Regions:
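Short, surface-exposed patches at the edges or C-terminal ends of soluble domains, predominantly
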Residues: 1-353
Length: 353
């Protein structure tokens, strides 16, 4: 009320006003009801905080998400349209609960689709395919191609992972869109650029700002390198979005610790870590496939980290590709101290200052 005459705030005692409880489903004492017209959303205390379990103190409040929960609820009851995001399932995909919460908190409607047994509806705007381990058959890929080719302004975001086996059918599908996923792992050879003393864990460089504002320190750890099959081919055009450092190299799968000690880099970066392919239609609209080399970049810890901008980056990608305007991105606020997530060079610089 202090900052906007469009919002009113009222405190209600359910004990004195029991009729209010009958108007809303499962409302309890302490809940927050956000209402606009005939649309409502109820928030509980668990919606306002991230709860974690510790070995010494049991469950505790790790961070506050009150701002994102309240803002999301207001957007949900006032927005005329939600972007529909569907997670592809049925092929051993990884589950990222933190990603689901981030999307829902930023007013995306999230569902699940198994393309092996059902068609992809026209109401879906974005498909997310996170590190499947089983190769899809021709019918699944035909449904994906139909979704992207017969409907304008549709998007598929694919996330690879170093634990995946060879997926010949899926990889051939991506190559037709100009994206090749290589069967190697990115490893950083410059100790000053690695994080937590892990050569597979370093920050990436944003090589194209089309989908983002100016950002730094997006982490794409445990990544597979990508390759542009072509820059332009008929109605398809590809763009590198993220890349490794120039000192990064690639290492074969399955190498032992002993072999790693004697391993010598033969090729250096930068290597593409994210590639966008756009298919243009005659009316100027397009559909898109974007591939990312790391499913780990969607992990709960990186999306909620204050040291990296992974959540900001992926929200910006989704907002831009779906033409969402006048949106705000809100992440959880950690209560108390937090690790800085510095690379080795930054640690030495601070330590010598």
């Amino acid at each position: 009320e202090k900052y906007s005459d469009q919002i009113s705030l009222e405190y209600v005692d359910l004990l004195q006003n029991p009729s209010l409880a009958s108007q809303y489903e499962d409302v309890q004492i302490g809940d927050i009801i956000v209402s606009s017209g005939n649309r409502t959303q109820t928030l509980t205390a668990y919606d306002l905080f991230n709860i974690e379990s510790g070995s010494y103190y049991g469950s505790y409040i790790a961070s506050s998400k009150a701002e994102q929960a309240m803002t999301s609820a207001i957007l949900n009851v006032t927005s005329t349209k939600q972007i529909q995001v569907a997670l592809l399932s049925g092929h051993g995909e990884q589950t990222m609960e933190g990603l689901n919460q981030l999307l829902q908190s930023n007013n995306f409607a999230v569902s699940s689709i198994n393309p092996a047994v059902e068609e992809i509806g026209e109401e879906v705007d974005v498909l997310l395919w996170i590190a499947p381990i089983n190769d899809p058959d021709a019918q699944v890929l035909e449904r994906l191609e139909r979704f992207l080719s017969e409907n304008e302004e549709k998007t598929l975001l694919y996330f690879a992972d170093t634990t995946q086996p060879q997926l010949s059918n899926l990889e051939s599908f991506l190559e037709r869109w100009g994206i090749r996923v290589q069967s190697n792992s990115i490893i950083e050879t410059d100790n000053r650029k690695i994080i937590n003393m892990n050569p597979y864990f370093s920050t990436s460089q944003i090589s194209n700002l089309t989908l983002t504002d100016t950002m730094t320190d997006t982490s794409i750890p445990f990544a597979r390198p990508l390759e542009q099959v072509f820059e332009s081919n008929m109605e398809l055009n590809t763009t590198v979005l993220l890349q490794s450092s120039e000192s990064a190299s690639v290492i074969p799968y399955g190498i032992s610790d002993e072999q790693l000690e004697n391993w010598t880099p033969e090729e250096y970066g930068p290597f593409p870590l994210a590639i966008l392919s756009e298919k243009s239609f005659e009316d100027g609209k397009s559909s898109r496939v974007a591939a990312f080399g790391s499913a780990v970049s969607l992990s709960d810890s990186l999306l909620s980290s204050g040291s990296f901008c992974n959540s900001d980056y992926y929200l910006s990608v989704l907002n831009t590709l779906t033409h969402r305007e006048n949106v705000i991105s809100i992440q959880s606020k950690t209560l108390g101290g937090q690790e800085l997530g510095l690379n080795t060079a930054q640690v030495f610089l601070i330590g010598s200052g």
